[in-house]
Amino acid sequence: MLNIKWIRENKELFDEKLSQRFIEPMSSKIAMLDGEKRKITSLIQELQHARKVKSKILGNMASKSGEEFEGLQRDVKHINEKLEALEHDLNNNNELNELLNMFPNIPDEEVPYGMDASMNKLVRTYGETNPNALNKQHFELGIKLNLMDFEQTAKISGTKFVTLKGDLAKLERALINFMIDVHTKEWDFFEISPPVLVRDNAMYNAGQLPKFAEESFATTNGYRLIPTAEVSLVNMVADTIIPREKLPIRYVAYTQCFRSEAGSSGRDTRGMIRLHQFGKVELVSITTPEESTNEHEYITNASETILQKLNLPYRVMLLCTGDMGFAAKKTYDIEVWLPGQKQYREIASCSNCGDFQARRMKARYKEFGSNETTLVHTLNASGLPIGRTMVAILENYQNEDGSITIPDVLINYMGGLQKIIAYSE
């Protein structure tokens, strides 16, 4: 959520930043609603003061009867009725909060202006792409290996699900352990095993609700399946005040993630790129405003390390204003090279959310010896999605005979297996 005080003091800049997100100017409407709310709040405070004064007089009166006493009683009763009505109006007029909840984060000064991915800015590349490399797509390879099943899975769960078998299931498990080991041992992230069912307020805190309600799976009893472990991890500090010396806090978690993929009809209809259920290793950092820019580079580099160790070509893109996520003020996308598609595809998003999530979930820190609190900054990064990493391995490590060479760093995690070959039942 955005800071209403900042909007109040920076109306023109607020409208300018909204326009960069392709949203019409809203400062005038917010000023009107904010003014009404502040007026009601001021009236409530005045009436509360008047009630306190009159109640004190009543309490000090020697005679608890008579015209003056009864008149003061009537005044207090009248004030209470007014207060009840005003407090009802204040509590039930949610238009201002509903409007604020729909605004995305304000873009950082470094974020390029643009409407879509075509305006994203290349930051760096890693590795060489080979235009003459073998170019079967991952699902062709997986099906031929008899280790990737879409057809039977569709009978169980419908489309956008997959069943992995044998050595591909083993590769999935190996990748999870490998990624967690790298992030905990080399990058100082603390491993968490969080819930995948969360309450709506946890989704709201992370910026998933109310705007993206249709993109998640809701249960019948007030819970939602997480679209990313970011939701569970950032809420680890909700409604807390953290001592400054404990920052940064860095969490890593592997979870299953669930997305309805509303609005993605027609895209990536085959294979493992876009699924309703997928495994992902997620990174979250909690830090101070002064350190969040450096922490953004840190968490991005942690994600990149996985691809470097797997020797997979990739590039890092700085997202433009029109392509950036709702809660982010600055995002790097990491895109891995897929020979089967002959293009780079997103494999990780690494975002600095500033105090946007922290304001929603009241996550603060304070210096030692001080009573003053400040909102933390939250950051997140994919570290990485298991399915898309497997896609990249299958396509970049495929052989003429359809077998898949195991990347060197995974051989020990695969129990010494160096190559995946077709499975014969």
Swiss-Prot record:
Enzyme class: ligase
Disulfides per UniProt: none
Catalytic activity: tRNA(Ser) + L-serine + ATP = L-seryl-tRNA(Ser) + AMP + diphosphate + H(+); tRNA(Sec) + L-serine + ATP = L-seryl-tRNA(Sec) + AMP + diphosphate + H(+)
A Gene Ontology molecular function term of the record: ATP binding
Residues annotated as binding L-serine: T228, A229, E230, E282, S382
Keywords: Aminoacyl-tRNA synthetase, ATP-binding, Cytoplasm, Ligase, Nucleotide-binding, Protein biosynthesis
Subcellular location: Cytoplasm
Keyword Cytoplasm applies: yes
Record keyword Nucleotide-binding present: yes
Pfam families with a match to the protein in the record: Seryl_tRNA_N, tRNA-synt_2b
Domain of life: Bacteria
One GO CC term, this protein: cytoplasm
GO biological process per UniProt: selenocysteine biosynthetic process; seryl-tRNA aminoacylation
UniProt-listed Enzyme Commission number(s): 6.1.1.11
Binding-site residues for ATP, renumbered to this chain: R259, S260, E261, E346, I347, A348, S349
Family stated for the protein in its record: Belongs to the class-II aminoacyl-tRNA synthetase family. Type-1 seryl-tRNA synthetase subfamily.
Notes on the domains: Consists of two distinct domains, a catalytic core and a N-terminal extension that is involved in tRNA binding.
Its biological purpose: Catalyzes the attachment of serine to tRNA(Ser). Is also able to aminoacylate tRNA(Sec) with serine, to form the misacylated tRNA L-seryl-tRNA(Sec), which will be further converted into selenocysteinyl-tRNA(Sec).
UniProt-recorded name of the protein: Serine--tRNA ligase
Source organism of the structure: Rickettsia rickettsii (strain Sheila Smith)
Lineage: Bacteria, Pseudomonadati, Pseudomonadota, Alphaproteobacteria, Rickettsiales
